[in-house]
Amino acid sequence: MPQLNPSPWFFIMLTTWLTFSLIIQPKLLSFTPTNPPSNKISTTTKTTPWTWPWT
């Protein structure tokens, strides 16, 4: 079974993850988001429970 032989695919997987972790990820994290989070105060609304007819 060729899937059990890690020789061909393990090096490719390791190279891909190292490339992503060391090169691509820092470049992507340097961008500023287009919609930064705001300091809004969350408002909670008062809800009244619904009365069940059989209780």
Swiss-Prot record:
What family does the Swiss-Prot or TrEMBL record give for this protein?
Answer: Belongs to the ATPase protein 8 family.
Highest taxon listed in the record's lineage: Eukaryota
Places the protein is found: Mitochondrion membrane
Q: Name one Pfam family in it.
A: ATP-synt_8
Q: Name one GO biological process term.
A: proton motive force-driven ATP synthesis
Q: Which UniProt keywords apply?
A: ATP synthesis, CF(0), Hydrogen ion transport, Ion transport, Membrane, Mitochondrion, Transmembrane, Transmembrane helix, Transport
Q: How does it assemble?
A: Component of the ATP synthase complex composed at least of ATP5F1A/subunit alpha, ATP5F1B/subunit beta, ATP5MC1/subunit c (homooctomer), MT-ATP6/subunit a, MT-ATP8/subunit 8, ATP5ME/subunit e, ATP5MF/subunit f, ATP5MG/subunit g, ATP5MK/subunit k, ATP5MJ/subunit j, ATP5F1C/subunit gamma, ATP5F1D/subunit delta, ATP5F1E/subunit epsilon, ATP5PF/subunit F6, ATP5PB/subunit b, ATP5PD/subunit d, ATP5PO/subunit OSCP.
Provide the Gene Ontology terms for cellular component: mitochondrial membrane; proton-transporting ATP synthase complex
What are the TM regions of this chain, as residue ranges? 7-24
Entry keyword annotation includes Glycosyltransferase? no
InterPro entries registered for this protein in UniProt: ATP8_metazoa, ATPase_protein_8
Membrane topology, as annotated, equals: Single-pass membrane protein
MF GO annotations: proton transmembrane transporter activity
Q: Which coarse location class applies to the principal site listed for this UniProt protein?
A: mitochondrion
**Stated role:** Subunit 8, of the mitochondrial membrane ATP synthase complex (F(1)F(0) ATP synthase or Complex V) that produces ATP from ADP in the presence of a proton gradient across the membrane which is generated by electron transport complexes of the respiratory chain. ATP synthase complex consist of a soluble F(1) head domain - the catalytic core - and a membrane F(1) domain - the membrane proton channel. These two domains are linked by a central stalk rotating inside the F(1) region and a stationary peripheral stalk.
Protein name (database record):
ATP synthase F(0) complex subunit 8
